[in-house]
């Protein structure tokens, strides 16, 4: 299996206290660069006589670049090349809506959502651009995450960032 991670952007709708993105350039990958990366992976797989490609979409917040992700997935489907492809995405989940949900289900994505704990713990670090916590917004998306799990049989994975100000609560997540 070839594991290809595509950073579709360096943009985010949050300003998490521990994040490095403040120092980034707020750019988005072009379709052509994503296509070149996929083409490279396909060539590599052929040389290795392998036929499994996993593409991980990350950011910033990758769902900000949903159109790019859709275009790159469509490209992979178009070239096919007798390659089995799996897709994953790591997201803060705040931009998830019905359209994105349908796309993730139709393309058999695995989904990882960032959540640092209960409301108090999560909202210490994961804040929006207005300085507000994001826990409540994410919880409003629970019905979409539940629908994803029911339709795919795949669990939503949780990405938990342990920092100096939440490490004592880590056992509450487990």
Identify the role of each PLM range.
Residues 8, 59-60:
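Short acidic donor-binding/metal-coordinating loop in glycosyltransferase active sites
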Residues 20-23, 57-59, 126:
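Short, histidine-centered active-site or binding-site loop motifs used for metal coordination
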Residues 38-56, 65-174:
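Radical SAM/AdoMet-radical enzyme domain recognition
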Residues 3-32:
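Canonical Radical SAM [4Fe-4S] cluster-binding loop centered on the CxxxCxxC motif
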Residues 1-5, 48-49:
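N-terminal [4Fe-4S]-dependent radical SAM core
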Residues 26-29, 61, 130:
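Pocket-edge positions in alpha/beta enzyme catalytic cores
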């Amino acid at each position: 299996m070839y594991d290809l991670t595509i950073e579709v952007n360096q943009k985010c709708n949050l300003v998490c206290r521990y994040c490095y993105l403040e120092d980034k350039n707020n750019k988005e990958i072009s379709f052509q660069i994503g296509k070149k990366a996929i083409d490279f992976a396909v060539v590599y797989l052929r040389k290795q006589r392998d036929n499994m490609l996993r593409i991980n979409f990350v950011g910033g917040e990758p769902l900000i670049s949903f159109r790019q992700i859709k275009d790159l997935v469509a490209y992979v489907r178009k070239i096919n090349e007798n390659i089995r492809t799996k897709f994953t995405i790591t997201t803060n989940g705040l931009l998830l809506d019905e359209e994105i949900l349908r796309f993730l289900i139709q393309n058999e994505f695995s989904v990882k959502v960032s959540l640092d704990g209960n409301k108090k713990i999560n909202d210490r670090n994961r804040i929006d651009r207005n300085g507000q916590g994001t826990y409540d917004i994410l919880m409003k998306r629970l019905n979409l995450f539940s629908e994803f799990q029911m339709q795919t049989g795949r669990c939503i994975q949780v990405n938990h960032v342990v920092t100096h100000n939440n490490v004592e609560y880590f056992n509450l997540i487990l």
